[in-house]
């Protein structure tokens, strides 16, 4: 059996986020001043977390957010980040660089709901979901392979699994679940993975967790909250568990969703 922690963070605010202009993949906008502050606040919030892996979309806003997080880490400042195009935002085709209101008008003209509508040259929701599944399955196989190698190397030696207190893998606030449910105590973690990505992409990935993998949710979290767009630098934590072995789909437990405690008191730049 192997399990790992997965922390997913949306990038910080850009000028186009604030102005409600669609970026997608074709508009590589940097963080705004507020966005850099958000990334720094996220880094301070996560500075005690011992991440073992870091993955980011290869777009500028996610790269800058990842840098803002890791440069404030007590343990991960020198960690190598793997930039992966599978973590990019949904491609919006002809409406990239245009106002969100234009996308809504096009969807209305096509008599479709905005999230479902695919503008010319854009990705369908299914295409975005398949990218997310492809990355997630790659990540799971990577962690399982590394866990097997560690087990072979350390046979006869004390376990080298990560510390499994949730306080060690995520600084949960008072209003969130404080432990992982387990029938056999608190099993070790093979890894703690940080991913920085984008709002529409994350919503699609979380839908896969909920719909296909039957992700369990905290009692205080509703399905609508799970499917809402994550705010800039909002954080979500999942425990991915291969208790039935690698040939069976993992179980997914959501510990918290769209957490933004780190933004309390942050002054927005005008």
From Swiss-Prot:
The record lists the organism as: Homo sapiens
Q: What induces it?
A: Up-regulated by p53/TP53 (at protein level). Rapidly up-regulated by p53/TP53. Up-regulated in glioma cell line in a p53/TP53-independent manner.
Q: Under which EC number(s) is this enzyme classified? A: 3.1.3.46
Q: Which reaction does it catalyse?
A: beta-D-fructose 2,6-bisphosphate + H2O = beta-D-fructose 6-phosphate + phosphate
> Hey, what tissues is this thing expressed in?
Expressed in the brain. Expressed in breast tumors. Expressed in glioblastomas.
Q: Which family does it belong to?
A: Belongs to the phosphoglycerate mutase family.
* Known outcome of mutating residue 102 to A: Abolishes the ability to lower cellular fructose-2,6-bisphosphate levels, to inhibit the glycolytic activity, to reduce levels of ROS, to increase oxygen consumption and to protect toward hypoxic cell death
Which Pfam families does this chain map to?
His_Phos_1 (PF00300)
Q: What does this protein do?
A: Fructose-bisphosphatase hydrolyzing fructose-2,6-bisphosphate as well as fructose-1,6-bisphosphate. Acts as a negative regulator of glycolysis by lowering intracellular levels of fructose-2,6-bisphosphate in a p53/TP53-dependent manner, resulting in the pentose phosphate pathway (PPP) activation and NADPH production. Contributes to the generation of reduced glutathione to cause a decrease in intracellular reactive oxygen species (ROS) content, correlating with its ability to protect cells from oxidative or metabolic stress-induced cell death.
Quaternary arrangement and interactors, per the entry? Interacts with HK2; the interaction increases hexokinase HK2 activity in a hypoxia- and HIF1A-dependent manner, resulting in the regulation of mitochondrial membrane potential, thus increasing NADPH production and decreasing intracellular ROS levels.
Q: Tell me the active site.
A: 11 (tele-phosphohistidine intermediate), 89 (proton donor/acceptor)
Membrane-spanning ranges: none
Q: Identify this protein by name.
A: Fructose-2,6-bisphosphatase TIGAR
């Amino acid at each position: 059996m192997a399990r790992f922690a997965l922390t997913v963070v949306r990038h910080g605010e850009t000028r186009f986020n604030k102005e409600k202009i669609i970026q997608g993949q074709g508009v590589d906008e940097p963080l705004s001043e507020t966005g850099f502050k958000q990334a720094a606040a996220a880094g301070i919030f996560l500075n005690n977390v011992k991440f073992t892996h870091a993955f980011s979309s290869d777009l500028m806003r996610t790269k800058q957010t990842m840098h803002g997080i890791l440069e404030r880490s007590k343990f991960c400042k020198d960690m190598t980040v793997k930039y992966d195009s599978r973590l990019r935002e949904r491609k919006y085709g002809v409406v990239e660089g245009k106002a969100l209101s234009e996308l809504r008008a096009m969807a209305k003209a096509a008599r479709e709901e905005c999230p479902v509508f695919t503008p010319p040259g854009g990705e369908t929701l299914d295409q975005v979901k398949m990218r997310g599944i492809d990355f997630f399955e790659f990540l799971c196989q990577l962690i399982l392979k590394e866990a097997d190698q560690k087990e072979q190397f350390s046979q006869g030696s004390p376990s080298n699994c990560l510390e499994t207190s949730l306080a060690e893998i995520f600084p949960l606030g008072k209003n969130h679940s404080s432990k992982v449910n387990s029938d056999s105590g608190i099993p070790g973690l093979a890894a703690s993975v940080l991913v920085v990505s984008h709002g529409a992409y994350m919503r699609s990935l979380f839908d896969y967790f909920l719909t296909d993998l039957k992700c369990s949710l905290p009692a205080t979290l509703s399905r609508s909250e799970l499917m809402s767009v994550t705010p800039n630098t909002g954080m979500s934590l999942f425990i991915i568990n291969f208790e039935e072995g690698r040939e069976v789909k993992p179980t997914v437990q959501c510990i918290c969703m769209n957490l933004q405690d780190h933004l309390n008191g942050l002054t927005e730049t005008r």
